[in-house]
Amino acid sequence: MDAPRGIRPLWRVPGIVLRERAHPPGRVRVPEPMVMDDPESVAHFHEGGLQNPGMQAVYDFGARAVDALLPLNGRLLDLGVGSGRALSAIVRRRPDLKVTAVDLAPNMLATAQRLFEEEGIDGQIELVKADITALPDALADGEWDGVSCMWTLHQLPEVEVLRGALRQIAAVRRKNDAAVWISDFQRLRDPSATEAMLQCVDPLSPLILRKDAMASESAAFTIDELAAELAAAGLEGMSRGHARPLPYLQAFWAPGARSPRSPIATSSPLRGAARREAMLLSLGFSAKPF
């Protein structure tokens, strides 16, 4: 039976969680194209980040994490900036940071540039068209206090490509003793879980955004898969956490030599439904750096 329009049928969540836990492992990953650059897809993805409280909460979560890991006036290398929403949340929270952000998709980079100019933060961010699996020497040899990779790894088509990206992150950390923040979707056991959960928690979200989220979850690596590849790349011993009760989001992090003892920013710009969603996400995450 369908819930009335606008009502979130949260009473269905326990059943979704139980089915996920009972489902046997072994679900096959369904890769996505490495570069999302179709103008219509980029536009829908970008606008969804502005209008959707759940996505705003996810971006705020990443901003709070990076805030806890980066020192005052720190330098951040962001791999896979996309349309810029996640990085915007970081820089608006921490206007002291200087960031170089990398992506391969021209339309994503152009969208991010417009966003940063509209928000008046473009002076703090340098955008570079580059492959995160083979960084230019100017970036690989740069001095960084932290390196972030947010909502990007699921776009990598093959495990060998993932390994290339993780080797770049490991090299930056090794050279600089830099902090690391990695966040992404996790592929669940039950292939129906993500769609069912979205119908519960975000029933009014546009269909194109829900389809994108389901495709991203299907393409994502599991926590165990990603943990093993991180260790193999030289990033062993990282802290990790995941969303609860359904572990559809995951994060790995490590402090750097100059990481602060506590977060530098103290307030959140979110209001209303987005602030509520951010609180629920933060409280539900199994572990986090803040």
Each PLM stretch: what is its role?
Residues G237-F252, G256-F290:
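Rossmann-like AdoMet/SAM-dependent catalytic core
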Residues D2-P71:
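Conserved class I S-adenosyl-L-methionine
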Residues L156-Q168:
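A short, conserved alpha-helix within the catalytic core of class I
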Residues A134-D141:
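Short conserved loop adjoining the S-adenosyl-L-methionine
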Residues S148:
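A conserved beta-strand element that flanks and buttresses the S-adenosyl-L-methionine
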Residues N176-D184:
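Conserved beta-strand signature within the Rossmann-like core of class I S-adenosyl-L-methionine
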Residues S183-L230:
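C-terminal alpha-helical "lid/dimerization" subdomain adjacent to the S-adenosyl-L-methionine
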Residues L77, S83-A134:
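Class I SAM-dependent methyltransferase SAM/SAH-binding core
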